Amino acid sequence: MEDKRLLQMQVFRAVVEHDGFTAAAYALESSQPFVSRTIAQLERRLGAKLIHRNTRRHRLTEEGERYLATCREILGALDDAENTFAGNSMPAGDLRVSAPLAFGTDQVLPLLPTFLATRPSVKVHLSLRDAIVNLIEENVDVAVRMGRLHDSQLRARKLCDLQRVVVAAPSYIERHGAPPTPEALKEHNCLEWHGAQEHLNRWPFRIRGERHEHVAAGNFRSSNGLSLAGMCYRGVGVMRMAEHLALPAIRKGHLVRLLGEFEDHDDTAIHAVYLPERRLSTRVRMFIDYLADAFREPPWAASD
């Protein structure tokens, strides 16, 4: 009897990766009825619903999320084995990466040309946004995350420490002066995060040996880190900015560091997170190693 399990895994993965039955059929050079029939057979065989279907989108069930992790592990191992016996030890296939907008643009994107040049059979799909993505629902292999990690189901590798500093443009200071103490920030226009990153509006300081927090308040807020940084550069307000953006701008004279003697750093870091598969594919493992090596000595900490 023909064993169709591997084919069903491949079709299921294609539906998830291409976000739908029609797109999966196109990618597989097959038909939409074949894809639908294969998924129905798979669900009957497993005795579980894997995909919620409606007219607008498809969403994995909890069972579907677990099965996808298994499919990725098995199919990734198969790809690695085929490459090995073909005399090709280099990774191949799609690599889906997510990163915050500013950090991804400023730090991850410049690393990709060398990575791709030395691994020509890998195709990188890079998604940049400040929202926390669900790796399974968004079909992401590796996500770069800044700050504390909250999803204990994911595995993580620390890339480097993450610190933020309070800054303002020289033009802002010329008009409004520099706050001499954290308490004085109440009289200043502080740029605010909106949405999933609103916790960053609580700025920590150390005053007379005790930790205090200032809640940022001002006339501009955004869910986008690059837009906040852009308004800070243009003299709109004061911002608590990640060092990868702030330190180079300070050295160039575009920003001025404020309240340095009161800084109280959070115990936070930048991590590469990935699904808890027992065996990572070669391309995912190599990319995480590549990031870890690149950020072992953070490039923004070095003098220009």
Regions found by a protein language model. Name each.
Residues M1-E2, A69, S121, L247-P248, ...:
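C-terminal effector-binding regulatory domain of bacterial HTH transcription factors
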Residues M9-F12, A24-A25, T61:
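Hydrophobic two-helix hairpin corresponding to the core of helix-turn-helix DNA-binding domains
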Residues A14-E29:
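Short helix-boundary/capping micro-motifs
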Residues L42-E43, L255:
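Conserved amphipathic alpha-helical core elements
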Residues E43-L60:
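A short LG(V/I)-centered, amphipathic sequence patch enriched
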Residues T55-H58, E65, G76-S98:
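Short helix-loop hinge/linker segments at domain boundaries
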Residues A92-R155:
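Central regulatory/effector-binding core of bacterial HTH transcription factors
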Residues L149-I270, E297-D304:
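C-terminal regulatory
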